[in-house]
Amino acid sequence: MKKRLLSALCAVMLLICAVPMASAQTGDAARWADALTVLHLLSEDPGRDLTTPATRAQAAVLLVRLAGGEKKPDTDGWFAGFRDVPDWARTAVNYANRRGWISGVSNVQFDPNGHLNADAWCAMLLRMLGYSDKTGDFEISDAAAFAWRIGLTGRQLIGILSMGDLAESIYDALDFCYKGTETTVLSRLMDLGVCTASAANALGLLNKDYTARQLADRYLSAAFQLSLYETEEQVHDEVSSADASGFFISADGLAVTNYHSIEDSIKATATLLNGETYEVERVLYYDTGIDIAVIKVSRTNQSRRTTSAFNHLDLVGTADIRPGDPVYAIGNPLGLGLAISSGIIGSTAHELDRYALPCIVNSADISRGSSGGALLNTHGQVIAVTSGAYTYGNNMYLAVPVDPVMAADLTVSGWTLKEVKAIEAAKNKD
């Protein structure tokens, strides 16, 4: 009992330490604002105060710039009907309202000087990207949480936003794709001539190399804690037999973990960074020798709320990796919560009897509970799945290549965890 209380206390302390500040840090905000100025998304203003609360009118103007609408502000003669919008924001407000991105506080009032809250701003961003609150993609009251869950924002925005918060969220949105496409916001801006590829490249936005902090902000929400149950009694008592890790590879809930993580389990749940828990529905692919599995996670959580999308990671495989390359591991060490660690690749093809494919040896720290997590390159792409370690080795951690998942047919109906357990039990009898 004491051990479980201590683990719970440690988890709470880690969570408290991980909670981001309510507003953008001044130094970071200035860097983001400078970058957006170079991209012509913010007006040049040496005296700008990024700590001041953002207004609804400012948000409308920045939203339209981010969409590339200011370059070609075609409103089809549309007038939103708001009588209180100042001249400098009128075209942007009409443009955004015409497309259903923003609305007023009444039929004739926009409240341009009203302070902007996180849910209102994230709802604007999401609509611009093709998500709809009207068709159930998100709820306005939950827009900021949804934006964080899908990786649009690097942290969950809360409360009244500052101009620095807007700069941060716009910067975060640059490498986010429009819904259902492979087109990023930045690539569309370049196509429209709002900014140039040379400017984006000079800012390090093309073929982006992330720092550990940037990867954590962007992709930690794509990983989850996997809780496993091996008996009906454990399921009934809601006491898991083990914890592991996993990560999403598609917005609709496809995810990867180790096979040994789900071995012998009859039920599994995935708990996200924000604390929401979703049940594992099916196993679409697994290989006991490679020690890898693809699972399908329900989009309805245990509170019976459904999400339209999850943040997810791209798979790139191991073809281009070399010893000495920096890597990052994300997972659930010791079951105490999602975390990131950094290291380098020591060997790209280490053979072990335990695995059917050569493993990647690296020095990014993992612990019990990290099995099934993602090993990332500096671009935030998955090269392997964290799997184990040498007990007596210093910084010798093992990861299995993700390449088989890239070649697998994931359109099959798959099996339940109980069916996988029965299939493997029958094989072992033979």
Label each region the model flagged.
Residues 231-232, 250-331, 335-338, 356, ...:
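Conserved active-site neighborhood of the chymotrypsin/trypsin-like protease fold
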Residues 133, 311-357, 367-370, 387-397:
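Flexible, gly/ser-rich surface segments that form the specificity/activation loops bordering the active-site cleft
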Residues 201-217, 265, 269, 299-312, ...:
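C-terminal cap/linker of serine protease catalytic domains
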Residues 64-65, 126-127, 171, 260, ...:
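Short, surface-exposed secondary-structure boundary micro-motifs
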Residues 209-213, 228-258, 276-280, 314, ...:
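A conserved glycine-rich beta-strand in the N-terminal activation segment of trypsin-fold
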Residues 2-32, 38-91, 98-161, 173-207:
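Feature responds to low-complexity, polar/acidic, surface-exposed segments characteristic
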Residues 226, 246, 253, 257, ...:
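Terminal peptide-recognition signature
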Residues 166, 247, 366-386:
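Catalytic nucleophile loop of clan PA
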